């Protein structure tokens, strides 16, 4: 077993004109590669390019290839893929202006605004009343030319984080927001506990993960009066920092 970073991928002359090396070794020498690459950052174009180069190596099994990884990172692509598979997702639209945010509020009431490419809940905001929260939307639009705008669902009952690995769901958590907060975010006071996911929730999680083509995923699923809603299928599951707290069996 070998470990290498995306920065250690390189083009070199080869028998067919060009070959790819991974940490100095020919890519063809590997049977499979497990991808846990980070695509965020100022150098994201370079990182996507390198991961795509790796995905194009003939005969190499990559878990998971660049197209799957990018779709899992993009909120817009993810919503499109899940909806096309008939899975329950929040009503979603793009917003490039305050007018479009206001129109969404008129249609859905409270809405969530966030960048399509984001992580750890950064710059995810709720606009519950457009007139009162207009400055929040204005600030986000000043930094992101296009925002994901989705209907907001109450989170008082918590949010499920289901981990899917192949056909198994080894770690299932219920995240509960802190008192007075709508955010199911552990870094902002939310708590979490393990629970036994019911069969219908497990099946939905497996279907969503298959639709995305992801091998190892962490799903955020919200229970609503109308049934489950799939918020996100993350290619990097995370474990809510629980490995640094109480030891559990993985």
What residue ranges belong to the model's regions?
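Conserved N-proximal alpha/beta basic substrate-recognition cap immediately N-terminal to
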Residues: 1-91
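Rossmann-like NAD(P)H-binding beta-loop-alpha module
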Residues: 85-109
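ATP-grasp fold ATP-binding core
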Residues: 82-83, 105-123, 145-155
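Phosphate-binding site of ATP-dependent enzymes
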Residues: 122-212
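Conserved protein-kinase catalytic-loop segment immediately C-terminal to the catalytic Asp
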Residues: 112, 222-223
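C-terminal active-site "lid" helix and adjoining low-complexity regulatory extension at the edge
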Residues: 196, 223-250
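Short glycine-rich anion-binding loops that position phosphate/pyrophosphate groups of nucleotides
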Residues: 38-40, 117-118, 236
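Protein kinase-like catalytic core scaffold
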Residues: 111, 148, 170-171, 217, ...
